[in-house]
Amino acid sequence: MGRLISRGGTVAIGGLILLVAALPLFWAVLNSLKHLLDIVTPTPRFLFVPTLANYRQVLSSPEVMIGLGNSIAIVGASVALGALLGVPAAYAIARYPVRGKRDIQFFLLSLRFLPPVAIAVPLIAIWVDLGLYDTKLSMIVTYLLVTLSTITWLSIPVFRRLPREIEEAAALDGYGPYAVFWHIALPVCANTLLGGVVFSFVLVWNELMIALALTSSRSATLPVVASAFTSLGQEVPWGVINASTVLLALPPLVFVGMLSRLLNSMVKGK
């Protein structure tokens, strides 16, 4: 009986958390299908005539397509480089006697301490001096600082929890340090490491402040383009804003689904 109550409480708490997390997205989807008059009514309307005009207005804007392409290129490159550099670095910190290990970990964590407002002006000055302002390269390097620190920090405890006996057994079979990492540690920890990669992707995909400061038109990301819809005319186009929010949330969901399927196929293949 006690176990049933405990399980029921866990399910209830999990359901409540899921409801709180999904409610904003559900509300955005609902409002994106409404006319403006249905959105601004004092009493929320759940019965209305749906319309796709908001999505048509968003998708008909060439800036949205350019922003989507910029976001995919910039975020994809920064996350891929962050994972390629951060995961091996985390394994080295977790498994080998690296000098200044604690200082390195504190430095990685300190990169998340500073708010974007504090570093926006120095970053603008640096990229303007280098002639790289409003370029994809400057955004990739800037976001790489976020993804690299996040993935490395989250991956260190994952490798520390890996039993050393597994690696020692592989070493006895003739595996070198690199082979132990690529063929043993990485496949075993892949499911957990995926969480850090997805988290860093969501962080930089939704980032607005730095993108707003470091881009103007050529390299503007999708959040920057979506924020411009708030200044269309004298009335706030809530339907268009909600439609752009829904479209902004779709790529991370697709990314998570594709990465999960790829990981599952790799695990089954082994």
Segments (PLM) and residue ranges:
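Short, Lys/Arg-rich, polar N-terminal cytosolic tail immediately upstream
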Residues: 1-4
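A structural signal for multi-pass alpha-helical bundles of membrane permease subunits
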Residues: 6-270
